[in-house]
């Protein structure tokens, strides 16, 4: 892990990242307050399943984002 990645994780933990609108049938409630383990799990699930509700996705993962926002997944 790089220092930048750790910094992003630390900052993102201070925000909210909602994970919903999954492509498969799995239903997961929005994550409002996430810890390290939940963040890691949320990040992996987001890379695989999260799709934007509207707009463009920016920062690190173009085309992949959560319906809400955090520093890694952002819908604008």
Curated annotation (Swiss-Prot):
GO terms under cellular component: extracellular region
Residue ranges annotated as propeptide in the record: 20-47
Gene Ontology molecular function: any one: toxin activity
Listed InterPro entries: Conotoxin
Secretion signal span: 1-19
Keyword Repressor: no
Signal found in the keyword field: yes
Tissue specificity: Expressed by the venom duct.
Disulfide bonds: 50-66, 57-70, 65-75
UniProt protein name: Conotoxin Cl6.4
Species of provenance: Californiconus californicus
């Amino acid at each position: 892990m790089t220092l930048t990645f750790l910094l992003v994780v630390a900052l993102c933990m201070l925000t909210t990242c909602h994970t919903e609108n999954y492509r498969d049938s799995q239903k997961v409630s929005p994550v409002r307050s996430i810890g390290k383990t939940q963040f890691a799990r949320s990040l992996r699930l987001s890379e695989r399943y999260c799709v934007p509700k509207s707009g463009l996705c920016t920062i690190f993962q173009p085309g992949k984002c959560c319906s809400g926002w955090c520093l890694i997944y952002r819908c604008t």
